[in-house]
């Protein structure tokens, strides 16, 4: 517990909250070839590697991921949600923030149904999260 005098001399320092998705908070100035502080909700990027990785201890699966080089020259690992995907190397994707708890180092999600990423096939519920169009009614 500080004394009144210590608080007058120094004061309280606010804690600075660290971003959960730091690559979305950087832009790139191609003329100056330098990074700028421009935050955005999503960013575009090009897949440099597409593969699978195994999750942390209690879980077991082959989770699909893509290594993405963003427009701000930062390379990040992004999760590919949903069943099945059409991504390859050099596919152009849109990423958003949001980590995957059981994959270490994966802090971003790829947006399904945007740019080169197709929506999930035959999905009926929660379609908006997976970029699936409304199915045609058969009468």
UniProtKB/Swiss-Prot annotation:
Keyword Transferase: no
Swiss-Prot/TrEMBL GO biological process terms: translation
Molecular-function annotations in GO: rRNA binding; structural constituent of ribosome; tRNA binding
Bias (Polar residues): 27-42
UniProt xrefs under InterPro entries: NA-bd_OB-fold (IPR012340), Ribosomal_uS12 (IPR006032), Ribosomal_uS12_bac (IPR005679)
Keywords, in A-Z order: Methylation, Ribonucleoprotein, Ribosomal protein, RNA-binding, rRNA-binding, tRNA-binding
Gene Ontology CC annotation, any one: small ribosomal subunit
SUPFAM superfamilies in the record: Nucleic acid-binding proteins
UniProt feature, compositional bias: Basic residues: 130-139
Region named Disordered: 12-55, 119-139
Record bears the keyword Plastid: no
Residues recorded with modification 3-methylthioaspartic acid: 102
Annotated transmembrane regions: none
Family: Belongs to the universal ribosomal protein uS12 family.
Function according to Swiss-Prot or TrEMBL: With S4 and S5 plays an important role in translational accuracy.
NCBIfam families named among the record's database cross-references: rpsL_bact (TIGR00981)
Assembly behavior: Part of the 30S ribosomal subunit. Contacts proteins S8 and S17. May interact with IF1 in the 30S initiation complex.
Name assigned to this protein: Small ribosomal subunit protein uS12
Organism of origin: Shouchella clausii (strain KSM-K16)
């Amino acid at each position: 517990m500080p004394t009144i005098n210590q608080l007058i001399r120094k004061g309280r320092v606010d804690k600075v909250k660290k971003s959960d998705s730091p690559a979305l908070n950087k832009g790139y100035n191609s003329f100056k070839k330098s990074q700028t502080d421009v935050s955005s909700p999503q960013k575009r990027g090009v897949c440099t590697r597409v593969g699978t990785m195994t999750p942390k201890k209690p879980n077991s699966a082959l989770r699909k991921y893509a290594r993405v080089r963003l427009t701000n020259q930062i390379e990040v690992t992004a999760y590919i949600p949903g069943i099945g995907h059409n991504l390859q190397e050099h596919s152009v994707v849109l990423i958003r923030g949001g980590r995957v708890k059981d994959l270490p180092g994966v802090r971003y999600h790829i947006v399904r149904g945007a740019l080169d990423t197709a929506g999930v096939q035959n999905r009926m519920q929660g379609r908006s999260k997976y970029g699936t169009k409304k199915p045609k009614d058969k009468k």
